[in-house]
A protein has these predicted regions:
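Extended, largely alpha-helical regulatory/partner-binding modules appended to the mid-to-C-terminal parts
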Residues: 54, 60, 87-90, 139, ...
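P-loop/Walker A NTP-binding region and its immediately flanking N-terminal helices
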Residues: 1-156, 162-166, 172-174, 254
Length: 347
């Protein structure tokens, strides 16, 4: 892959949604917020909860714009680094003054669960009797750490992590805007590496696209750039399970380990393919769906292997590898969980 100049603007900023209709996968939240704005039912405090990279801060900024708040009346604070009582006192002093040129002063506080106990106590007093011209938007990845007395005074929205289908569409659309086309299995790998985060998916895709002048990108190129386990090793594991070839399976695990592959990711990739193999063996009628998810060569490989799979490919096999995925990383030997799974399913 040939190196090219770095993009002028990082993807997660370049493609950050600017209006509600650009927000992906959070229709349940957008609909409520749009309705509230239309009716003029504005809450004095919102609490956005969800995993990292799901769009909480982006939606907070969109909401502030939809409320007609200009930059001079928008205040953002990261509670991870501004978590003390003095930081909250400065907010309490600020809220008493009227907006410069907007109807509302909006305060976006990210990672709000990081506030200290004293800071929470001080902030609660402001939440109990907020000025009419102030709107707080709190964002957190750990809502269980937010005091119930605060949660009860906020309108709470839970952001859902995007599923694989949403992330794959997301990858395809951004790649298209950048003038690239990714093979289906390359799209799948980028989405898997994104791990339920739009921001992480942005970063991985940017890394891939900025490393090549090729307009058509294969899975192998994504593997080379990201250091993901090679698809051949995943195929070797599948064959070892179906054909009951333990040495082949253990060899694949060993090769992945030697290349410093992330065993959690390796097991996840194996699970993705085992599921497809299982569905093909059962003749569930999902052939077309699976064909859209993988490359033509991979679909041919899976179809052929499924025809050879009897009782060696059952639901219990999938369950055993799910357990291996959950167990990976619990010991100082990363590959152990996968090795044990293979010895259990290959008799």
């Amino acid at each position: 892959m040939k190196k090219v100049e770095k993009q002028e603007q990082v993807f997660y900023r370049k493609y950050r949604p600017q209006i509600f209709k650009e927000v992906i996968g959070e229709d349940h939240i957008v609909k409520v917020l749009e309705g509230a704005i239309k009716l003029g039912n504005i809450s004095h405090a919102y609490l956005f909860s969800g995993a990292r990279g799901t769009g909480k801060t982006s939606v907070a900024r969109i909401l502030s714009r939809e409320l007609g708040t200009n930059a001079s009346d928008l205040y953002e604070m990261d509670a991870a680094s501004n978590r003390g009582i003095d930081d909250i006192r400065s907010i309490r002093e600020s809220v008493s003054t009227l907006p410069f040129e907007s109807k509302f002063k909006v305060y976006i506080i990210d990672e709000v669960h990081m506030l200290t106990k004293d800071a929470w106590n001080a902030f609660l007093k402001t939440l109990e009797e907020p000025p009419a011209h102030v709107v707080f938007i709190l964002a957190t990845t750990e809502i269980e750490k937010v005091p119930e007395t605060v949660v009860s005074r906020c309108q709470t929205f839970v952001f859902r992590a995007p599923n694989q289908k949403v992330l794959k569409e997301f990858v395809v659309n951004i790649a298209k805007k950048e003038g690239f086309v990714l093979a289906p299995d390359a799209v799948e790998l980028v989405a898997i590496l994104g791990d339920g985060s739009f921001r992480d998916t942005h970063g991985i895709l940017e890394k891939v696209l900025s490393s090549t002048t090729d307009k058509k990108i294969t899975r192998e190129e994504v593997e080379a750039v990201t250091g993901a386990p090679k698809s051949k090793l995943v195929k070797d594991i599948l064959e070892s399970v179906v054909l009951q070839d333990l040495p082949k399976g253990l060899s694949a695990v060993g090769q992945a380990s030697t290349s410093n592959a992330d065993m959690k990711l390796f097991t996840k990739l194996i699970l993705e393919r085992l599921r497809f193999l299982f569905l093909l063996r059962l003749k569930t009628g999902m052939d077309e769906h699976i064909k859209e998810e993988v490359s033509e060569d991979d679909f041919e490989f899976l179809t052929d292997l499924a025809s050879k799979a009897g009782q060696s490919m059952t639901g219990s096999v999938l369950l055993r590898f799910i357990q291996a995925y959950e167990d990976t990383g619990r010991t100082t030997i990363p590959e152990l969980a996968l090795e044990l799974a293979l010895t259990d399913v290959i008799k």
